[in-house]
Amino acid sequence: MKKILVAVDSFKGSMTSIEAGESIEKGIKIVLPDSQVRVRPVADGGEGTTEAIIYGRKNVNAEKCTVTGPLGERLTVSYITYDADEGKTAVMEMSAAAGLPLVPEEQRDPMHTTTYGVGEMIKDAVSKECERFIIGIGGSATNDGGIGMLQALGFSCLDADGRDVPYGAEGLGVLERIISPYKPERGGNTVEFFSVGDSGMHSGDDVDVALKLSYCTFLIACDVTNPLVGELGCSRVFAPQKGADAETVELMDVYMKHYADVVERSVEGKSDRYTPGSGAAGGLGYAFLMFLGGKLTPGIDIVLSETGLETDVEWADTVITGEGRIDAQTMMGKTPSGVARLAKKHGKYVIAIGGCLGDGAEKCIKEGVFNECYAVNNVLGID
C-alpha cells in the first residue's frame, strides 16, 4: 500500500497550505484509492507558520491581545503558546501587528508606520511566562529599524532633547540615545552595553518585563539576506514596496545609517548592520540581533523542527511538496526545497507541485532537489 506525505506551502491568493494539501489528497485518492495519505501544512516562517505548528504539535494554546497597529490604531492580534523542552514557547508573526495588508494602499508610508505592536505582543507573552519566542518577520509595512518594538518593551529611544522619538523611520533621523531599563544577565548579542536609564525613566512594569526578557531566547524566522543599510539594504530594496518614493527611500537609508551609528558607537567591536538578514522587516532583524540576542534562522528549518515533520517523512514512501510557483528561487531556502532536503535525507521520492513553473524550474530537477515537477500546464522530470 502506497504511503504518501503531502506537505505543501500555501498557494498565495488561492489556497492555504492545508487547503492545497487536502485538494492534492483528493486527487491522489481518485487515482490511488487504496493509498494512505497524510496532509501536513508547512510554511517558511511567514504566512501560515502558526497554522503549521498548530497541526504539528499537541496542547497548543491560542492567545489574543490588543496592540498598536502600524498606523497607531488599536487592533486585536493572535499568537500561540505551548510547552516545549526549551521552555514555554510563543509563536507569533510580526505581520499580525505591523503587516502591509493592515495599511490601506493610499496610506502606506514607512516613514511613519511602526513596529510598536510587535513589542506589545512580545510583552503580552512575557506576562504569560513565555521564555522562548519564535517570530516570523515577513510581510512588514515598516522601516523603523525595530525601535517601535523596543519602545513598547520599555527602551527609551530619545532625541537630543531627551524626548521620545516619533513612530516610524522618521524617529531614526532624530534618534540620539537608547536607554535600556535593565542590564541583562545572559551573554550574546544583548543590550548589556547600555547603562540603566535615569530614575523615573521607566515604569515598574517596564523594568519587570525587561528583566524577564533578559532570560528569553528569540528564534527569528528570516528568509531574506539583506543587510540593514546600503544598496541592498532594507530601505532601498523593500521600502518602495511599502509606499516610499525615490526621495524618501534615500532619506530613510541615511536615517538607518544614523540609527546604526547611535547603537554601535556604544558597542566596542560590535556591528550587525551588514549581517545578512539584519535588514529583514525594515530593520527589525537588526533590533533583534542587537538588543534581544535574536538568532536569524531560515523559516522552513524552524517549522520542520517545531512540527516534527521528519517522523512523517520517515513513514512515507513518497513526499509531495510545492507552492504557488516553482522556479529558481525555490532552491533558495523556500518551503519546497526544505521539505525536499528532509525527504532526500531519508531516501524518499519527491514530487513538487506548483501553480506554475517559472524560469529555473528545470534546475530543481537537474540538481536533484525534486524527482518530478508538476504544474497546471507543464510537467518536468518524467520520461
Task: Please describe what each predicted stretch is.
Residues 2-137, 141-383:
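N-terminal loops that bind phosphate or other acidic moieties
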